[in-house]
Structure formats: C-alpha cells, structure tokens
C-alpha cells in the first residue's frame, strides 16, 4: 500500500511508447487527439495524494485498498460517476470512508483475472465485450498488485455513432482524479494493444511491484458469488507472485493446481524457496495474509504443497512463522485479532506436525504471536482475541497450545496471562470491554491447562501494575453479563475458599473493593449479581473483607450489611 508522490504525465506515457514500442510521431499525434492514450483531466489536480494520510472515525488509517474500494462503490452506485469532493479533502475522506466497511467489501468473493503487464488491454477488451453481451453500461473492478490497490472503471456511453467505450483508472496516490481513455466501436479492438505502460510510468511500476515480469489481479465483484473463482489463470504458475496472490485472495484451486501440475522436484533450491515463500516486494508473506483474512482451505492446500515440495525442514519452519513488517507482525497474531477460529485450527495442525523440530524459544515466540507497534512495544495475540471478544478463536488457540501442550507450564501461564508491554493482562481488557463469551472461553482453556491453583488464581485475578483487578473493572462498569461470566469461570476453577475470597475482594487502586465503587455508581444490578456469586461460592463477607485493609474492609462489610437489610 505505498503512498508515494509520483508525478506522471501524458508526456511520460508517450515517452514510454516511443522508447519501448518505437511508435511513430504521426501515431503519437493521432493518439493525442483521439483520447485513446490514458490522460488526466485538466479539471482536477493529479498532484493531490491523501493515501495513508487520513484516519477514519474509529482512528484506523485509510490506505489505498480502502480508497479504491470506496471509489468502486461510488462508481457503481452512480452508474460510472464519482464525486471527487469526497476524495479531495481529509475531512471528507474521514466522513465518507469507513475502514471496517471497506474491509468487508474487499473480502467479498469475486471473479479473478491474473493479468501480466502486457495483457491489460486484452482483459479490458474482454470485459467490455462481456458488458455488451449483458447490456451493461458500467462496471468497476479492483486492480491489485503485490503491494498496492487501484480501481478500474469501465463505461459504455450511448452516442449517435454507436457508443463510446470509456476506461478510467483510479490510483489512490492521485487521490482526487483518474486517468481516462476513450474508444468507439470502430476502434474498439485497439484497446487490446494497451499495456501497463500506457497507464503507469516506470517509477509507478517499480513502486507497485510491476517492473519486469509484473503481475496484477483484476478483481470483479459486480455479480455476487459464493466463492472466488479464476477466469484467467496466470501464464506462468512459477511466477513468484502467483502463490502470494492465491494465499491473499483465498484461491485454493490455484494452490492445488500448482501442487498437481508443477514438477517441484525439478526446480532449483532457490526457485523453489522463492515460489513457496510467496512474498510481495515488501517481504509480506502470503501465509500471513491468508491467516489474517481467514482462508482456512487455502492454508490447508498450502500445507499440502509444502509436504510435496521436498523443501528442507529448516526452510519449511521459517515459512510457517509467517512473519511480516520486519518481524513486527505474525500471521497467528492477525488471525487472533480478527477472530478466525477455523484458520487457527488449520494453521495449528500444520505447526504441530513440525513443532518438535522448532527450537524452543522460537516456538514460544511464535505461539505468543506478538504484534509490535510502531515503537516496538509488544502485544500478544491472545490479548487481541480477548479484547475483541473472539470466543471461538480463544478456544482454537487453547487447543493449539494445549492439545498436547507445546510448552512447559511456566510458559503456558505466560501465554495465558497475555500481558502487553505495560503489564495489562488480556482478561482485564475482556472484563473491561464486556466480552462475556470471551471470558467463558478463557475459563475453558484455563481449566484445560491443568495449572496449579495458585497460578490459576493469579490468572483469574487479572491484575495490572496499578493494582487494578478484572472483577473491580467489571463492577465499576456495572456490566451484569460480564460479572455473570466471571462468576461461572470462578466456580469451575475449583479454587480454595481463601483463593476465591481474595478474587471476590475485587481490589482496585489503593485497595478499594469493586463493591464500594459499584455502590457509589449505583450499579445495583451488578451488585445483586456479585452477591449471587458470593453465595454460590459459599464465601462469607467477612472472609472477603480479610483481604482488604482495615478501612476498605469496614466499608465493604457496611455496604454488604446495608444491602442485605
């Protein structure tokens, strides 16, 4: 998703044709007047670049794929017209572009065309003919390179001469305009001569990973489909970007075809490693993106490809780590963050086959699934799942690390604590965010871990460095469902009365009990639920008060007395 200030012009496009195709001056002059050569309109500035410069209302960065997706939606909604006022100002982009909504749109199944640099015109010509057959007047597609997203808009305009065929290429790095070319029915076949050079100069191609034998994917979602399918296959299955695109898009059939058709044993070690690494020009692996996007079947097919490849074990393990951004993120952390439970299970099966061959500390780091922010502060993957309420993903993660246990007991405890850089535990965030189902799932894997009672109690307390405990936060917020869930996992933990009463003290900063804060906040339903937990555990208020200092213990007992009366 590079954001770059590259200044293309019609002159550069012409120069490409002169240098690469030896086109005559007369032909160039003819093209200039015919509008067959893609150009920017004088009505809008092509210098404006707001890609990766604006966040949406949730604070998430708006990048090229979100801008391209929004452009496609506007093009389709308005039969080929786009209001560039929505793209021309940061505040307008913030108001109109939602990262979560665009991510949903991007992940909808689609018709896929693999397109080499020299074949852009062939595919555009094919789609125009398909539009004619179906009496369509406009259609928009996503164009995806290995590290950038653009949009393609096609229109058929009625004219007295039988119709004009308009091509629009939207590049988010020229945020408030598009390239345009126009043909008519008499010269429609000339579209087939268009290549990537007619739309992007060399600097753009290099930045977008399209230099030399570049490959793009044209993604057509205009007709709903239950699963993605490939209309145009890549000419070369050994192209280093083929498996990357297949993993990213969930194109299982393509991975299976490579496994079935390509004689992997005939490849050199270097070619085989490059093919299976499936990385884009920024070093981002296709396996990471498959985990991020939840493509379980594709990951399974990739595992079978690895099995048949004969790749040495060390290299195979290296690929399965699925790291990106210089080790800042891993595929497992992305799967946990997005709640892809089945994907985690599939990945877990691949990992467990080779776990015995992975050096222990590397395996531990891999399973912790750290995400490192911009200043290299670490956040464990399980924390994301707890914070976001992904209950099934939490259970899948528990199955991965516990069935059978892949680490020693101490490291399992650290994984389950899921403490981020500031020592805040994941369960605390789940309790704070009201993620009742996630809390219940956490209780399930806690029991599965078969830890000693002291460690289990420590994890259930979920206390940060400031003395803030999980139950304190739930009582403070007054979330009844969360407190009920906590009561259930406390009950199934089978702690001693002393341990259970300590947790029910629900201490916060300065030793204040959560009950006191709940009473002050008039969270009476939460208090009623809390008292039900105390009764269910056969714990007396006096046993709980013993864990508080004299003043807070006295206040606690006074409130309990007043409520009962």
UniProtKB/Swiss-Prot annotation:
GO molecular function: peptidase activity; toxin activity
GO BP of this protein: proteolysis
Pfam families named in the record: Toxin_15 (PF07906)
Phenotype of gene-disrupted mutants: Host cells display necroptosis.
Top class in the EC scheme: hydrolase
Effect upon mutating residue 171 to A: Abolished ability to cleave host RIPK1
Physiological role: Effector protease that disrupts necroptosis in host cells by mediating proteolytic cleavage of host RIPK1 and RIPK3.
Name listed for the protein in its UniProt record: Effector protease OspD3
